[in-house]
Amino acid sequence: TPWKHSQSSVKKWGGEPKDYIALHDWFDETKAFTGDWTHRALRHHSAGIQWAIEKFGHTIKNSKGHDIPTKMLAEQHVEEDCGFIPTPADYLKQIKNNAQKWMLTVGKKTITTKLEIA
């Protein structure tokens, strides 16, 4: 949970859990889409770590006044959940190896409703 990740961050870098909760909430908010561990495919990878830096800046200042590198905090989160830092390709490879028919359909026409303005 984000709280447990925040407590882990405190053990590594000091401060209070509230210093880190926004970052860890951000990684895990994708649970709203899937409700299970598969949410990790959306942010728990090397690109997600870069996105975290873009969102939170290069450092997060903790309550002790220390600037903690966002990259290290994000890597901590991903490593705690995945055991290593996967790339997006690591997740996509699994999809490619088990592609569903709807994923392979090319050129299928979609129906678009015509907008009429009175």
Short names for language-model regions:
Residues 1-118:
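N-terminal membrane-targeting hydrophobic helices
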